[in-house]
Amino acid sequence: MNKHDQKKKRNKQHTDNVMGKKSKGFIKNKKNIGESGNEKKRNNNFNNIWKKKKRSGNSEKDQVDILGLLKGDSENMNDDDDNNMNDDYNNNNIKGDYNNNNIKDDDVDDDDYDDDDDDNFDENKNCNDNCSSKHKRNVPSKKEHDILELNNINFNETRKKMINYKNIFDGKFCDLKYILSESLINTLEKNEFIKMTSIQKMSIPLFFKPNDIFLKSMTGSGKTLCYAIPSIEKILNMKEKVKITRDMGIFVLVLSPTRELAIQINNLFCILTKPYPYIVASCITGGEKKKSEKNRLKKGISILTCTPGRLLDHLENTKSLKLTFLKMVILDEADKIIYLGTQDKIKLIYDMIRKIKQEEFSKVHKKKKKEENEVLDHINDTNMSDMNNISNDHSNDYEQFILDKFQMIFISATLNHAMKTLANYCLTNNTMWIEKEKKNGINGGNKNDETKQKSNDMISCMNRENSPLNIHNNDDNDDNDDNDENNGDNNNNNDDNNNNNDDNNNKNNDDDNNNTYELPEQLKQYCILIDMKQKFICLIYMLLDCIEKKKKPVVFLSNHHSVEYLQILLKNIYWPTDVNKKNIEVNKKLNEKITPVLEREDEKLLRKHLEQNILNNNYYNNNYNVGNISYKNINLEEIQNEDELNDEPGNLYNINADKHKRIYLFNNVNIYILHGNLSKEDRLGNFMDFSKTNNSILLCTDIISRGIHFDSLSVVIQYDPPQILEEYIHKVGRTARLNKQGSAYLFLLKSQKQFLNILKNKNIQLKIILGNTIINHFKKFCIPNFLKSVGKDILNFLHNHMQTIVKSNNTLMEKGTSAFLCTITSFYSTSKNLRSIFNAKDIHLGHLAYTFLLEKTPKQISKYKKEQNYINIKKQTVLSKKEKRLLKSKQFQKKQKRK
């Protein structure tokens, strides 16, 4: 052998010993190996690559050990589990290094998901940071142990779920050509309704049957199109036999619990009925003049969406309401209607519509009999051909569509005992139960995941006897029998049909324990465990973070007073820019040493501002010439001391001195509010403006918690705890709709941890974020640089500043006191299930006042509220001249400030 061949053998043996069997995978071009110098370079490169490979392998094992800690297991994971995780990783083609930060649900998503989203809000990251110091001992800390007991997440399973989360779309609307007309399919495609969800695919054909239907599906699955498309198609099918006009009256009636949802449903019907001018869609929700609504009803409405109270009023008082050709009555978000306590109105509406339909059908039936008798009388005088012409009259064509029955449809995402009783009362015609079900025992993450997921999701369609609507209790059956007997008495004894509220609540609680809820898998749910004092600052950080990432957040609150208070407060909050020199000693006690906040540029701006104020005052008060005033030698310290005399001694900030250079936290951000006490115009205006604008925040009560759809809504924040368990599910369902990603955050105190266990029983798991982590992020990323010199107690510094803002504004004080008192009363209206967890007695009222930025004690706040109510009443009454002077006097205002 040549020397050259011997060198080749040695180099090959060396590379095989170092790299083993995997050396083949790293050698790209074997043919080019010829010269000895190039061979040495390549071999060195191979050695370096293999060393890096070994290091990365060791780090992966260490990271898997950390995962074992996060699971709560003292033992490390097996090698088989490691191989399975690596196989899943390779199969799913996820980009990025397989390190500890990537093993979390925030980052393991589709390629479209942004890496920056929710990096700061990951509780696994917090756990990993805490576990890094304890990794050597393999012993978690107490905080970690508490979190792990609550979390109990199998990371391997959740990771697979988030990689292969379920696609709710299944087919296209053009696949339903055998049911839907071409024109309707074209209108759907023009309006970008191309794909349909699995619940739409299975339920739309069933709506063409005459049976009553109860449709139950998760939020964001497209339930409105499930009934909107068949209702329009049924009217189009009538067109083949009869000319459709507005005089025929209402064909489809949709009942909605709120105005906003009714408007949204009506907008969808208006879009789908644009090519059909003879189909008129309209909305009646109250708040308008009845004359205008009656005029619209006289002209004729084909598809009417309305609220229950307004419809009941028109059924009782408006004669122009035509229901002769009524085909469908749809109750959307039925659980919300029951929660609002309007189930009695719906029973009345159902009975009245049923009575009207039977009367009109009997009239038509009598007409038919008269015509038949007339035909029989004239048989001898007429031929058979003439008789056929009589039977083919246009009036008979219209009469064949007049029926004594109509299709009743219930649509909801949840089910409870009160809903069952209402459904059993209204759904009487061979009721069909449609629900999306899951089979247990099918594990995701294998190669055949997609085929298994299709078999995993099933649409169950069953009769009343086999459905969850069947109530097996004898007491309930007796109640239903009593209700059926009272139906024929023209609703004279409607109060006897209602059960006691306490009995209904107990039945609801027992029934809720058996139900489990389904939510979209792409929805990320977080629970923020905080102390009461940290609550407001955590909210500010989350809102600022959403604005930076260009996300639209919705904040749910318990009452309308806190909604109005937060709106005014967020608009008026600004960073502290000027510190009183009189109170610099107070700041030194808080911190060892504080550098002056004002810089030279700020001093120049302040000097110019003060100079102009002096010029204006002298010009208006003394009428001096502006040129004669010597303002060049103005002393800033003397002027500031004069301004400080007007301020209270306890304030840290001179509020009036820094108006010219305030930096507002939510500058150029639109903050909208929605609650039931707003006027109709304001509600509609805020609703439409928020849906159109991008850089905006919505503060609201539970008025939009059900059925409302916002396209670009990505964050839901529940600042106050839910009063009912179902309320949490519906609020969370405003985001992550139609396969879009979204995140939901729930604020909970540490004493309210048991609520997470209740959600676990309902197949809902939340990741926990500690409040301290959010506050640390707030200190790092949100506080401006000129305030970082304050030191560690920056939060107390900022809180005192915000308290002075509230103190100086009378409207903020009034709104804050009313919001504080209403939040306390809201805890007393929680359901019996949650009353032990969200108990008003467990809340520290002083800390609650601290979150509302109120300096006074709870007793002082209640006294202040009584005085304000007394003053407001006195202002409305007729006052004497002395009383008016007393209210305007400075002495009276000073007394109020002291109080």
From Swiss-Prot:
Oxidoreductase is among the record's keywords: no
Polar residues: bias regions: 463-472
Chain residues that bind ATP: S217, M218, T219, G220, S221, G222, K223, T224
EC number: 5.6.2.-
One annotated GO molecular function: RNA helicase activity
Major place of residence: nucleus
Keywords on record: ATP-binding, Helicase, Hydrolase, Isomerase, Methylation, Nucleotide-binding, Nucleus, RNA-binding
Residue spans of biased composition, Acidic residues class: 76-85, 106-121, 476-487
Effect of K223E: Decreases ATPase activity and loss of helicase activity
One GO-annotated biological process of the protein: maturation of LSU-rRNA from tricistronic rRNA transcript (SSU-rRNA, 5.8S rRNA, LSU-rRNA)
SUPFAM superfamilies: P-loop containing nucleoside triphosphate hydrolases
InterPro entries listed in its UniProt record: DEAD/DEAH_box_helicase_dom (IPR011545), DEAD_box_RNA_helicase (IPR050079), Helicase_ATP-bd (IPR014001), Helicase_C-like (IPR001650), P-loop_NTPase (IPR027417), RNA-helicase_DEAD-box_CS (IPR000629), SPB4-like_CTE (IPR025313)
Top class in the EC scheme: isomerase
Residue ranges with Basic residues bias: 1-12, 21-31
Compartmental location: Nucleus, Nucleolus
Short sequence motif DEAD box: positions: 332-335
Annotated stretches, region: Disordered: 1-142, 463-517
Sequence ranges assigned to domain Helicase C-terminal in this UniProt record: 593-782
Gene Ontology CC: one annotated term: nucleolus
UniProt catalytic activity: ATP + H2O = ADP + phosphate + H(+)
Superkingdom of source: Eukaryota
Cited PANTHER family: ATP-DEPENDENT RNA HELICASE RHLE, ATP-DEPENDENT RNA HELICASE RHLE-RELATED
Family (UniProt): Belongs to the DEAD box helicase family. DDX31/DBP7 subfamily.
Chain's role: Has DNA helicase activity and may also have RNA helicase activity; the DNA helicase direction was not determined. Shows ssDNA and RNA dependent ATPase activity.
Protein name: ATP-dependent DNA helicase DDX31
